[in-house]
Design a protein with these regions (language model features):
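Short, basic/hydrophobic alpha-helical segments
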Residues: 1-7
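Short, conserved catalytic/metal-binding motifs centered on acidic residues
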Residues: 9-12, 84
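RNase H-like two-metal-ion nuclease catalytic core shared by retroviral integrases
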Residues: 11-13, 17-26, 33-59
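Short, well-ordered loop/turn and helix-capping segments at boundaries between secondary-structure elements
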Residues: 31-32, 52, 60, 82, ...
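Short, solvent-exposed helix-loop connector elements
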Residues: 57-73, 95-96
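Intrinsically disordered or highly flexible coil/loop and linker segments, enriched in small
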Residues: 64, 82, 86-97, 128, ...
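Charged, gly/pro-enriched flexible loop segments at helix/strand junctions
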Residues: 78-119
């Protein structure tokens, strides 16, 4: 569950993202579905970057059997999402236009913040929150653990997760 309103869902052309179940759910939630152009590898550079830094870095490159999906989803929803959104900084580029009108993206020290800090930095950020979600409640989540505490908790959680699912691969 996201604390903010989702207006649009952008996917590549893969059937794992565009199928009857997903389309039906998005229609029911009044969320617009857009997709990438076929065979345009740079359309989803940000998604592919996140896939590498989030999924592959933390779960590895091996095949994950579908039967392990529920326990992996629990790991992501129970602990990892808090780490990712409230404690792990990301770079948000500043766009600079040169004399010729070309836009260049640069990363200044102040451009590094967590996704939650970025949300808070937006003008009228409260307008983007789901009903019943407040900045104060999200602040409590952000402050209940230090960066080191949550990082240690995530590492322990991943260790326990791999101990549950990896024996299935070794047999």
């Amino acid at each position: 569950k996201f604390p903010f309103k989702v207006f649009e869902f952008h996917a590549d052309n893969g059937s794992e993202y565009i199928n009857r179940v997903i389309v039906s759910m998005l229609n029911k939630l009044l969320i617009k579905l857009t997709k990438s152009r076929s065979r345009q590898t740079n359309d989803n550079a940000q998604v592919e970057s996140k896939n590498g830094s989030i999924i592959r870095k933390w779960m590895g490159y091996g095949f994950i059997d579908q039967k392990h999906a529920p326990v992996i989803n629990d790991f992501y929803f129970d602990i990892f999402n808090e780490y990712l959104n409230f404690h792990r900084p990301c770079g948000f580029a500043t766009e600079i236009t040169d004399k010729k009108g070309k836009i260049k993206k640069v990363y200044k020290p102040q451009d590094y913040m967590t996704p939650y800090e970025k949300l808070k930095s937006l003008t009228n950020c409260r307008l983007y929150l789901e009903a019943g979600i407040t900045i104060e409640a999200l602040d409590k989540i952000a402050k209940r653990k230090t960066d080191n505490e949550i990082a240690s908790e995530v590492q322990d959680g991943r260790y326990k997760l791999f101990n549950k699912i990896l024996p299935a691969y070794s047999s």
